[in-house]
Amino acid sequence: MRALGALIQRDIRIALRVGGGALIGVLFFLTVVVLMPFAVGPDLKLLARLGPAILWLGALLSSLLTLDRLFMADHEDGSLDLIAMARTPLELACAAKALAHWLASGLPLIIATPVLGLLLNLDVPATSAVALTLLAGTPALTFTGMIGAALAVTLHRGGLLLAVLVLPLSIPVLIFGVAASEAAITGPHSFGAPFAILCALSLVSLVVGPFAAAVSLRHGLD
């Protein structure tokens, strides 16, 4: 457990450095939210209706933007080989790296959501509801994205390949995240059903993601 804690702290420190990826994701999220009101126009009701979808889409794209460095940097400097040969199971190491990625890249987006939601004409209860759905759903984006990041490393491809692999897996999270947000804000549909499915997607990805990523890395590093 001490080794996993050290790995999490190391990845968070690297991500928070200039050029480490976390700041890039937050700035991209901020850019998406700030530019959308100019694209939508002066219709504040339309902007508020689109607000949850804009916030969720920004979070998805920001997460995708930073996923390519999840394993690639360690692969380039040889750290990934040491992690694979360590006594700690590779599945737990993958889970620790995904957790560090979420803490450095996903959690800041959730914290910023209540403030940025005001730019989309959402009131405080509405932005709080969106932040709650992001808290439940963004782990699924990270842990499913980890599978694509591992495949991109083993196939020595990044960028477009990662997007092609991850986006289909992220669509259900996006659908139920937006549905839960809209149900909490406007109704009349129940908030509980889509939110429960969103939590279930995160739990399933939490279990399946590390094992799938570890299998991919083992085959790629052999």
Q: For each of these PLM feature ranges, what is it?
A:
Residues 1-25:
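Aromatic- and glycine-rich beta-strand/loop motifs that create alpha-glucan
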Residues 19-41, 56-59, 165-176, 202-209:
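Hydrophobic alpha-helical transmembrane segments of multi-pass membrane transport/permease proteins
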Residues 39-50, 114-135, 181-197, 220:
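Membrane-interfacial helix-loop-helix connectors in multipass membrane proteins
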Residues 51-67, 71:
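Long, hydrophobic alpha-helical segments
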Residues 64-84:
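Transmembrane helix boundary and interhelical loop/hinge segments in multi-pass membrane proteins
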Residues 95-120, 140, 144, 177-178:
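Hydrophobic alpha-helical transmembrane segments that constitute the membrane-spanning cores
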Residues 128, 133-167, 218-222:
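A structural motif at transmembrane helix-loop-helix junctions in multipass membrane proteins
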Residues 205-222:
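Junction motif at the cytosolic side of a transmembrane helix
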